[in-house]
Each structure stands twice: as structure tokens, then as C-alpha cells.
Amino acid sequence: MIQQYILGTAASVSAISSKNGCSALTVNEQLIGLDEFGQTEPFGYCGNIVPLSTSDKISSMCKELAERIVLNFGLVGSNGVDFVVSDDGVPYVIEVNPRFQGSLECVENVLGLNMVEAHVKACRRGLLPKVRNAISKFCTRLILFAPRRSVVPDLRRRAEVRDIPVPGVVIEKGEPICSIIAEEKDRDSSFRKAEGLAQKILGSLKPV
């Protein structure tokens, strides 16, 4: 199979749909192939930043495409559509994910919305959530991977750390260690906050 390689920004749309309609909630930036956080795959998923920092035009295009795709396939509940937004601002559809997405926590944080509750209401009662148009903060979810075979310390006291392994467990090289959630008023500050904690955690690993 030959596929065209599109230079641009990895993105996604998080949507809630019922049998009668679809509401695209957020356009999200996807973090892909970040080897500084232990990800060894060039296209490996490393988390999200919500929302995607882009123009209203591009955001609207992505949301409209996602809604059309979800409705065309008759999907119900929480669904995601992945894109690459090319350097000249054209969104290319990559795949459809008829499930909860890795961006769930960040979408909940920036919208103040319970995504599981919204999913159930859409599936059982056909109700779509009402969300605010203006988003006043950015949320980063950063997934850390073991750069080498390591023993993980106790991470339970860090409120920003999620998906926490048992203290003292051995994590193999390239396997996920944990997720970090960081909120700030702008995109770069949110990412830097997550990045700073990530470096502290990576520095606390004990090679074995």
C-alpha cells in the first residue's frame, strides 16, 4: 500500500452523537512520536493538548467534517475523528474512533463536562450536551514511556499524575509509565508544566 505523507499538525475532534444528531465538542492537538518522553515509535501516541491552537476557520472545518462522518456511519455516543491539518490549513481525515478517546480527561477539564454521563445520555435518551463556545484554558495530557528498563517510584502523591503503576514495579523499555495532566491559560504554558513534571519523574526512575 502507498499512502501520501502529509506534513502538518496531528489533530482530532471529540464528539458526542445520538441517532438524530452530532455535537463536535473540541478540536484537539495530538502529541505524536515525542522521543524525549520515551516514545520509540515515530508515529506513537503521546497524549493531547486541548484545544488545538488554530484559527476559527480551521477549527470549524474539522468539526464540520467530524460531524458529517459520525452521522454518515450512524455512530452513537462518544466518538473521535483523527486528522492531520496540513501546513496550508487543509484537514485530512486519518481515522475514526468509535469509542472514548485518550483526550477524554482534557476535554472534561476544559469544558466542565462529564463525558461518560454525556455518552450515556446520548445512547439511552438521544440527548446531546450543551457546551460553552469559549474555552478559557488549555489542558495537556502527556504520556511517559520508560527510556530503559526501570523501577518506578511511588507517584501517588502527585495530583497531576494519572494511570499510576504499583510503586516498585519494573517497567520495560518503551512501555508506558503514567500520564500527566496539566492546565494553564495558554497552550505553551500547559505543555511546559507537563514537561517539567515529566522530566522529574524520568529522573526518579531507577535502571535495572
What are these regions (language model features)?
Residues 3, 75-88, 131, 151:
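A short glycine-rich, hydrophobically flanked beta-strand micro-motif that places a catalytic Asp/Glu
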Residues 4, 48-51, 178-183:
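Short, well-ordered beta-strand elements within core beta-sheets of diverse protein domains
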Residues 7, 11, 15-68, 72-74, ...:
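ATP-dependent carboxylate/phosphate-activation module, predominantly the ATP-grasp catalytic core
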Residues 10-15, 89-90, 151-153:
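Short, solvent-exposed polar/charged micro-motifs at secondary-structure junctions
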Residues 17-22, 86-89, 147, 184-185:
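Short acidic-glycine loop/turn motifs at beta-strand connectors
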Residues 117-208:
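Peripheral (often C-terminal) accessory segments that flank ATP-dependent C-N-forming ligase machineries
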